[in-house]
């Protein structure tokens, strides 16, 4: 088992891994509440004939690259059923703080990623209460208020 590190240190170590060849399928049931996520990731890679990540950086890079790849796959499915071209992906909640993953996502999806708000659920709740109280008229006004109140970070594909 690897020692505990802060998320910024983990991102830094993952950034230093240039050639990741280990990927997981994040939706696989084996990743739902395992006793050890690290051991489960390593076993998954072993079972699927991939190099087994050992270091913090290798494991985090495997996770981030796998998530970005999955986002791209799901975006492809959505494009099949959408009548409009999807040109921007919005990431909200805690994941919106992860600069490295957001950039990997922009690169994997080939589109702009807008990250934020971090507290999307709470802001949505406040806006619904404002609507119920008659303080806002519609969803467009709610979106304008939120957009004017928070910082949204923009990530463009680099590949």
Regions found by a protein language model. Give the residues of each.
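Active-site core segments that coordinate phosphate-bearing ligands/cofactors
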Residues: 1-88, 97-121, 127-158
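Glycine-rich Rossmann-fold phosphate-binding loop(s) that bind the pyrophosphate
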Residues: 94
């Amino acid at each position: 088992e690897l020692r505990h590190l802060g998320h910024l240190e983990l991102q830094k170590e993952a950034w230093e891994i240039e050639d990741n060849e280990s990927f997981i399928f994040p939706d696989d049931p084996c990743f739902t509440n395992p006793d050890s996520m690290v051991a489960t990731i390593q076993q998954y890679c072993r079972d699927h004939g991939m190099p087994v990540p050992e270091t913090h950086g290798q494991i985090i890079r495997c996770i981030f690259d796998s998530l970005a790849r999955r986002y791209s796959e799901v975006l492809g499915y959505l494009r099949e059923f959408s009548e409009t071209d999807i040109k921007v992906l919005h990431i909200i909640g805690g994941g919106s703080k992860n600069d490295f993953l957001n950039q990997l996502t922009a690169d994997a999806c080939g589109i702009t990623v807008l990250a934020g708000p971090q507290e999307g659920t709470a802001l949505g709740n406040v806006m619904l209460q404002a609507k119920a109280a008659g303080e806002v008229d519609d969803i467009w006004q709610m979106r304008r208020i939120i957009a004017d109140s928070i910082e949204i970070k923009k990530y463009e594909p680099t590949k």
